[in-house]
Curated annotation (Swiss-Prot):
Its EC number is 6.2.1.-. This is Probable acyl-activating enzyme 4. Keywords: Fatty acid metabolism, Ligase, Lipid metabolism. Gene3D superfamilies: 3.30.300.30, N-terminal domain of ligase-like (3.40.50.12780). It comes from Arabidopsis thaliana.
């Protein structure tokens, strides 16, 4: 059998892009995307994506294979279509968080060398400001997204845009043959983790890793044919945990939501008989505590990730009719690679013990290869006793290719021993279930947004009154975590207040990155070598009101 080798007929590059073509054939007349008064079928979505890809590939634009095309917008049909259309043209898809400020946005556009940006009209002034910071020869062209009924008929900024999205699409050829990757290792998407510094973390995923992550999502959640999926999770967050492509594979009805509004969510769930949704723990908390909350007409499966929601939130959500699952993953894995697979015997446990079992992040998903907890120095596995801590490591097909333009960062996390080191701390239980004890020391996950503590610290250090600064995550019932800043001052005369520090940060950071708490200390705790002991600050943050 050693003479049997791979052949062109059995080694086609793996890619999720074919899911859309199949959806058009199998689910052609079924609704694919719904938003306000807009309804598209899968056949229409396929055609629209082909047209967009065709225009992107046209010689007049000059966008070559492997070059970056960015998307800045909320959960609207055009943003969903671009998850397919951009890579179908051979370009690399780059979703960007629209909540970033203009300076942060300009840093990402320059780092990615983006050639064209699709931007929602609500963010048009932001993007124009961001582009103005770039040298003229590095400025990408702009196309404005005009989903919905609130698009202005004209704008003073129209001259700055190449076209509207619909106009751009109409220029395309329906007969266009989408660009199949020559290799499944060809880059497909570029996602930034939390980064607005001069050295942002750009995570590159190949067609292969995206395919593996998407199949993972389908299998782990047992997503059936024709589910009704509510888009409460931003598509710009790791491509919606790969459900942008997974929903096409099963012909889902995608209900688009541009912002988290509890009454609207409950109304949409009832109106469309929603079956599935993903949400940050903060959204679950909002749904269970809002005056508009009401029992569901039929069960809704909810996938949440990040810090596990408190048992009280899970019980409240399940009382309303939500079937909650949670897991763990990173931008670097393209979605969830660990999930809390429930065991039947847990139902026989006392409520408190059952909640304890369910609060663990869980076990590797079916398609992922290996998850372990290892000593970061020796590289050896720690005891699987639920008590010995170590660094969480991954190995599997959905792990990224690496960090864009950052070989040192790539080598530091993807090491020669064959593991990807997450930077997160956890324990492994005897039954093989992982429990995260501490997220990466440099990341605060606030309402689903990744906030880099090092970036926030860099801003704090620009304040002339601050001598030392450290930012950690403070647990929060609503947001999951909020940034908490510990600072020591150059002068202890009481002239600097918490409010002044917060106002200072507001002038330099997006609103969501501003620390909710500022704690003044005479000196920050340090090791004998002078390193700030953040674990002590985290303990202090937990005790704050």
């Amino acid at each position: 059998m050693e003479l049997l080798l791979p052949h062109a007929s059995n080694s086609c590059p793996l890619t999720v892009l074919g899911f859309l073509e199949r959806a058009a054939s199998v689910f052609g007349d079924s609704p694919s995307l719904l938003h306000t008064t807009t309804v598209h079928t899968w056949s229409e979505t396929h055609s629209r994506c082909l047209r967009i890809a065709s225009t992107l590939s046209s010689a007049s634009l000059g966008i070559n294979r492997g070059q970056v095309v960015s998307v800045i917008g909320p959960n609207v049909p055009s943003v969903y279509e671009l998850q397919f259309a951009v890579p179908m043209s051979g370009a690399v898809l780059n979703n960007i968080n629209p909540r970033l400020d203009a300076h942060a946005l300009s840093v990402l556009l320059r780092h990615s060398e983006s050639k064209l940006v699709f931007v929602d009209h609500h963010s048009s002034s932001l993007v124009l400001e961001a582009v103005s910071f770039l040298p003229k020869d590095e400025r990408p062209r702009l196309v404005i997204l005009n989903d919905g009924n609130d698009m202005p008929s004209s704008s003073s900024a129209d001259m700055d845009f190449l076209d509207t999205y619909e106009g751009f699409m109409e220029r395309g050829d329906l007969r266009f043959k989408w660009v199949r990757p020559k290799s499944e290792w060809t880059p497909m998407v570029l996602n930034y983790t939390s980064g607005t510094t001069s050295s942002p973390k750009g995570v590159v995923h190949s067609h292969r890793s995206v395919f593996m992550s998407t199949i993972n999502s389908l299998l782990d959640w047992s997503l059936p044919n024709r589910p009704v999926y509510l888009w409460t999770l931003p598509m710009f967050h790791a491509n919606g945990w790969s459900y942008t492509w997974a929903t096409a594979a099963v012909g889902a009805r995608n209900i688009c939501v541009t912002r988290v509004d509890v009454p609207t969510i409950f109304n949409l769930i009832d109106k469309y008989q929603v079956t599935h949704m993903c949400a940050a723990p903060m959204v679950l908390n909002m749904l269970t505590n809002h005056p508009a909350q009401k029992p569901l007409q039929s069960p809704v499966k909810v996938m949440t990730a990040g810090a596990p929601p408190p048992a009280t939130v899970i019980s409240k959500a399940e009382a309303l009719g939500f079937d909650v699952s949670h897991g763990y993953g990173m931008t670097e894995t393209g979605g969830l690679v660990v999930s809390c697979a429930l065991k039947p015997e847990w139902d026989r446990l006392e409520p408190d013990e059952r909640a304890k079992q369910k609060s663990r992040q869980g076990i590797r998903t079916a398609v992922f290869a290996e998850v372990d907890v290892r000593d970061p120095i020796s590289g050896k596995s720690v005891k699987h006793d639920g008590a010995t801590v170590g660094e969480i490591v991954f190995r599997g097909g959905s792990v990224m290719l690496g960090y864009y333009k950052d070989p040192e960062g790539t080598a530091a996390s993807m090491r020669e021993d064959g593991w990807f080191y997450t930077g997160d701390i956890g324990v492994m239980h005897p039954d093989g279930y992982l429990e995260v004890k501490d997220r990466s020391k440099d990341v605060v996950i606030c309402g689903g947004e990744n906030i880099s503590s090092t970036e926030l610290e860099a801003v704090l250090y620009t304040n002339p009154a601050i001598k030392e600064a450290a930012v950690v995550a403070k647990p929060d019932k609503m947001w999951g975590e909020t940034p908490c800043a510990f600072v020591s001052l150059k002068y202890h005369d009481g002239s600097v207040t918490e409010r002044e520090i917060r106002e200072f940060c507001k002038t330099k950071l997006p609103k969501y990155m501003v620390p909710r708490n500022v704690v003044f200390l005479e000196e920050l705790p340090k090791t004998s070598t002078g390193k700030i002991q953040k674990f002590l600050l985290r303990q202090m943050a937990k005790s704050l009101p």
